[in-house]
């Protein structure tokens, strides 16, 4: 926890009470603390950010070369072409676009597709339907990717058993299913206890794959010629449509690149950049070059080039390490999906899903039961449907490439509008990157009927859910607005003919403070009473990840008995009404929680033929509304102080 400005840390206060310290020594201690903290973040990013892209060597190079050979001989031209494509894809897509460009496009320190969408809309100064569509599509495809990443990663690691113990070949799929079920089962307990081991394990993984690559490069040093981009260009020119197909498989080497930006808020730009340039990128390149040299020297190794890098006695330990690395990579993707869904809820794109906190000290450690169950079902179905990592490789990539295209276009808006670049300069920087993304997207479309339809289907389902929810909410607001009463009109009416006044404070939750909350109208109509203090409470979501205490609360007295309070939360925050109201007390709002009642409206929806949506969408919206988490729980309001008022609304 950071100390407030002007305050002293515990170590500084200790020194003040014991002795007068040497200023030079204090400066060195502070510098040392900053340095150690920086390297801790750098190591931490290795354990969380790079799991997906770090496990790509298990299958990416093998699949690309195998398809390029088309059951023929593996030639040096194929190996050098594929290696060059992988190397320059890592340079352009991951290094240039994400590590050097988008990591600078932070939304108050946060990254990710929805964060970039909010940043772009803020830069434009208005809500853009194009940016909203890009954000929704990009986020939805990330959810589709969240299902396929654990499946292909764990399955490709366990497949090493075929080499270590051939008799266990029939147990690869069952063992993969067991590992995945266990992974999703422990989510409800949180990962704080084991998260500290993620970074050392992944650091060991990257060092291991680097060493394995180095040990084989000497078998054919000519693979280093792949640094020349001409080999990539020559390969594409000479292979026509097949070259585009291979690009779809080469893309497997950069999947996970989008995670660098999504995890920006957890570690910061510099630690991620240092980890990438100093450890991750060199390790990946050395391993890919090692696999290339191995295939040129031993073409039969194409069966499983990654595990063939290791001496026979070390294959089983490597399988264990690879499985651990893929589980960590899967964990990072699952956590990212939770975070993305919560952001979507806060931004009004999805209904309120139940959120459980698995750590008392880290607000980001969350668990979403329904999301976890849906992800588990999707992952298990993928494993059972495709059964091999080679089969899943055909399905992998379409969702990630869609997200990357969306990120690129939104990145252009940020560079142009927020950074105030000339449109031509912004286009010169971003358009080439987007063109490369579009090439990969086109290449992955060729895999549509080979399995890419599966994650695409998951992504489209998410788009439909978001579209239905937003459309339904808009229709609901429009219909209820017809019967709502302006708040000022009611106050004037009550001043002329006051009802019976009871002691205490009533807090009415509403989405629009200009109109009378339904719960207040029902209280007056049925109970015929009015509290001596009435607060119209609205909860807003800012276009920034977090909101400082100074911007959290806005209060306004409307009359002697009525006031409005607006609470603002960032889209990365968990709304906590009692804590926010504690800030309001410091600002002068006098209230006693024990004499305060919270009035919440609960709507029961029924469809009508004139709703404006098809019947299937009406039913879907009503189902989503019923499945939404209770507002009382979501906003963490004390249940003992809540009065719920039920109303029926025909949409």
From Swiss-Prot:
The gene is kup. Residues 1-31 are annotated as: Disordered. GO terms for cellular component: plasma membrane. One of its GO terms (molecular function) is symporter activity. It is found in: Cell inner membrane. It comes from Nitrobacter winogradskyi (strain ATCC 25391 / DSM 10237 / CIP 104748 / NCIMB 11846 / Nb-255). HAMAP family: Kup. It catalyses: K(+)(in) + H(+)(in) = K(+)(out) + H(+)(out). The chain crosses the membrane at residues 38-58, 74-94, 129-149, 168-188, 197-217, 232-252, 276-296, 309-329, 366-386, 396-416, 423-443, 448-468. It comes from the Bacteria. Transport of potassium into the cell. Likely operates as a K(+):H(+) symporter. It is a multi-pass membrane protein. Pfam families: K_trans, K_trans_C. Belongs to the HAK/KUP transporter (TC 2.A.72) family. Residues 1-16 have a biased composition (Basic and acidic residues). Keywords: Cell inner membrane, Cell membrane, Ion transport, Membrane, Potassium, Potassium transport, Symport, Transmembrane, Transmembrane helix, Transport. This is Probable potassium transport system protein Kup. Its main location: membrane.
